[in-house]
Amino acid sequence: MGLFDFSVKELHDKLVKKEISPFDLVSESFNRIESVEDKVGSFITLNKEAAFGVAEELGDAGIDPNNMLAGLPIGIKDNIVTKNLRTTAASKILENFDPIYDATVVSKLKNAQTINIGKLNMDEFAMGSSTETSYFHKTHNPWDLSRVPGGSSGGSASAVAAGEVLFSLGSDTGGSIRQPAAFCGVVGMKPTYGRVSRFGLIAFASSLDQIGPITKNVEDNAYLLEAISGLDANDSTSINQPVERFSDSLTGDIKGLRIGVPKEYLAEGVDPGVKQAVLDALKTLEKLGATWDEVSLPHSEYGVASYYILASSEASSNLSRFDGVRYGYRSPNATTLEELYTKTRSEGFGDEVKRRIMLGTYALSSGYYDAYYKKAQQARTLIKQDFINVFENYDVIIGPSSPTTAFKIDGMINDPITMYSNDILTVPINLAGVPAISVPCGFSDGLPVGLQIIGNYFEESLLYKVAHAFEQETTFHKEKPNL
């Protein structure tokens, strides 16, 4: 049994009692990375020297019994800036970017005394659902190396599933934590928009992006969200909501829970194996005293279209800062200022990023703004209202995290429309801004299936309670890929 088979709480107790040291945990991480990283490719940059340095310091000082995450190894998605540690957003344009400050979540993790093992691979600028658009390399799913780990936080999910780190941070703009968590058989939480500071997150779509934790089990996830949540003066969209002790909500008692299951989430297009795993999960929850009814989120059908217009529009604005003048890649082939802009961006951005910038710029252009951007915003309002309506009568909404299990590498990369439409079950949650968690709920043809539990605004504690109660009745989270 490896050290990462233990939970956060178990490892914390061992550290406090000095049965193990932070150095042991960091060694476990790098030994595992040495043995499997060539196969999975979870990381872009490793932080080996600094990680061992922090581990030695913490070992010498002793672990604070009140600091649950102290001495534990974490991986951080490479769109979250880390001071003096290369941060690339998996793009050529930021290949050698060395930030001069830490993101708020990174500062919070340092205060919690976690140890950063390195920066995790992702789709370039978080644009993708497969971690195939990274400038550096593709990440492979630990359960089947011929398949994708999901995206855009594919490295964050694969590193946890492969046992390279104990837990990780990802970001979720349209499903980028939940879908890879589902594909890799781990737990991923997208918090309520504004629950976690975005300061230091390299922006894709500012009204949709949210940072969240990826872990092996629900309890670990709750501890990590406690550490990174809270109001931040540096992020005007962060919300002044008390940081709850999410870990206190894991009582296992969900008697009387009212579940809404949207008919749109189990409709045509959802793999039969995925649908069956979700129905079996609902039976498990019924045994625990919950009830469920079929409900409708009637405007879900507009989710993907409105999401791709809005997210691409925001991206075209956000990514205009990468111009070759201030930081990042600068084309050596430019002779005029105009050439500097066009060549830097043409050479520095990958195809998918360029596709979305063009789509967004088109949607925002004067002749098309009303027809596309404005209409997408109206659809977003209707989607948000759908959730509000269901939550008047139900505590949580449940469905699959993805309509399929992990697909083959190179299987969809040249078919963007199919890839985009695969986000149908996750993007409405970002458009509405509500929280959702993906937990392992079974297997289909040997590949993990994720159960998506969606809550009302700031109801993360309830999501953890439901997810934990389900997890206690099953063993899916204990299954490990055979690498």
From Swiss-Prot:
Its EC number is 6.3.5.7. The gene is gatA. One of its GO terms (molecular function) is ATP binding. This is Glutamyl-tRNA(Gln) amidotransferase subunit A. Allows the formation of correctly charged Gln-tRNA(Gln) through the transamidation of misacylated Glu-tRNA(Gln) in organisms which lack glutaminyl-tRNA synthetase. The reaction takes place in the presence of glutamine and ATP through an activated gamma-phospho-Glu-tRNA(Gln). GO terms for cellular component: glutamyl-tRNA(Gln) amidotransferase complex. It holds the Pfam family Amidase. Heterotrimer of A, B and C subunits. The keyword Transmembrane helix does not apply. It comes from Listeria monocytogenes serovar 1/2a (strain ATCC BAA-679 / EGD-e). The active site is at 77 (charge relay system), 152 (charge relay system), 176 (acyl-ester intermediate).
